[in-house]
Swiss-Prot record:
Subcellular location: Cytoplasm
Keyword Transit peptide: no
Gene name linked to the record: aga-1
Subunit details: Homohexamer.
Protein name per Swiss-Prot or TrEMBL: Arginase
Cofactor note: Binds 2 manganese ions per subunit.
Amino acid sequence: MSPSLVDNHAAAYIAAPSSAKAPMIQKPGNTFGMSSPIESKFLSQPRDLGIVAVGFSGGQCKPGVDAAPSALIESGLLTQLREELGYRLHGDDEVHLYTDLVPKEDPPHRNMKNPRAVSNVTKRIAEQVHSHAKEGRLVLTLGGDHSIAIGTIAGSAKAIKERLGREIAVIWVDAHADINTPETSGSGNIHGMPVSFLTGLASEDKEEFFGWLKPDHLLSVKKLVYIGLRDVDPGEKRILRENGIKAFSMHDIDKHGIGRVMEMALGHIGNDTPIHLSFDVDALDPMWAPSTGTPVRGGLTLREGDFICECVHETGSLVAVDLVEVNPTLAAPNDVGAHETVRAGCSLVRCALGESLL
């Protein structure tokens, strides 16, 4: 990855790519009674878990989010998924940095910063996710900033359409709507635009600027649900209203409670639709997840975040999970914030993949 997207401090957290991609150990461990017995509706290999570790920060300007996959893995997440929840892990033990896809010069295009790098990397991610999803595996992607969801959702949408002839639904858990178009964005950071490209509200003909996105990569706005919103740009509010997109803000959660919100969210999607869960850790209140690039006070508790993940798992419809925007380099020296944010991220993933309290 070019120096413009990663600094030396962030690189210290990232495992150096191995010269050969060593396969992950695929033998499942014991579940010790901790894994939910929910039967998957849409996965032919529900105990097989495809892992994509994405060390990429080019969708925004703060270095360090590319260090998250290594921090999550070093904290024992993959070992927990294998030995405690009984998954067979597929993929490799490399955190992908995609340095070969990041051009030396990447001037803005239509107000987008690093457009070629983000387009190139998300196209590769789409291919990686698709390679797992087409085999009927559940796919877990560890980011990385939220621009990577252009790739993860495109890959799972394409695979599900090919394998089952169905469209996916997306539950987007985030403080932000990330549905700016290049023209409505105030910052030009693409991590605030992925949903507009995934729904076709923003598009490009040129391959180097997301022109690789085709109809089979895209998501219907009718199958999109937001949870946890509390920092939404004026242009995004207009987009949400004009397109009738289902969105539950923190006001809705305060008013109805997270249990009722999840009932309404899942009722909107329906029980016959594969679900891709994309979870930005900044959906949590900074009390629980301070080490993230755009924290916003007044967010979800960790227990509410875990509950969202548990509810999605209990549907039996989950086909893919993203965890994004953990930034372990933002904490001050001797600050426990990075550790707590990584712990929170691991908890969210485990709950989405079936960890139960009893």
